[in-house]
């Protein structure tokens, strides 16, 4: 799966695949291929969300409060 997709692009592709599968007129082999691709997109989205959660935890700090920003060398 292309990891360079943005979260929004991956969700859009996933929604498109789900829509195709929900129509119910997809041949079995094609449906399996769509399902596999959808699972990969789902995993990619999950990884991106976890990454954002980790970034937010760093930004907010352990107590959930916004940490003050200090520029490099600005240790006053």
From Swiss-Prot:
Record keywords: Cytoplasm, Exonuclease, Hydrolase, Nuclease
GO cellular component, one term: exodeoxyribonuclease VII complex
Principal location class: cytoplasm
Reaction(s) catalysed by this chain's protein: Exonucleolytic cleavage in either 5'- to 3'- or 3'- to 5'-direction to yield nucleoside 5'-phosphates
Subcellular location(s) of the protein: Cytoplasm
EC number: 3.1.11.6
GO biological process: DNA catabolic process
One MF term in the entry's GO annotations: exodeoxyribonuclease VII activity
Pfam family, one: Exonuc_VII_S
Domain of life: Bacteria
Self-association state and partner proteins as the record states: Heterooligomer composed of large and small subunits.
Family indicated by similarity: Belongs to the XseB family.
PANTHER family assigned: EXODEOXYRIBONUCLEASE 7 SMALL SUBUNIT
Role noted for this protein: Bidirectionally degrades single-stranded DNA into large acid-insoluble oligonucleotides, which are then degraded further into small acid-soluble oligonucleotides.
NCBIfam families with a match to the protein in the record: PRK14063.1 (NF010666), xseB (TIGR01280)
Protein name, entry field: Exodeoxyribonuclease 7 small subunit
Organism: Bacillus cereus (strain ATCC 14579 / DSM 31 / CCUG 7414 / JCM 2152 / NBRC 15305 / NCIMB 9373 / NCTC 2599 / NRRL B-3711)
Organismal lineage: Bacteria, Bacillati, Bacillota, Bacilli, Bacillales
């Amino acid at each position: 799966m292309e990891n360079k997709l943005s979260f929004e692009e991956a969700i859009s592709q996933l929604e498109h695949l789900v829509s195709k599968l929900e129509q119910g007129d997809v041949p079995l082999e094609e449906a399996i291929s769509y399902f596999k691709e959808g699972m990969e997109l789902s995993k990619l989205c999950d990884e991106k969300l976890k990454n954002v959660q980790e970034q937010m935890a760093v930004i907010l700090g352990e107590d959930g409060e916004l940490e003050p920003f200090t520029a490099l060398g600005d240790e006053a």
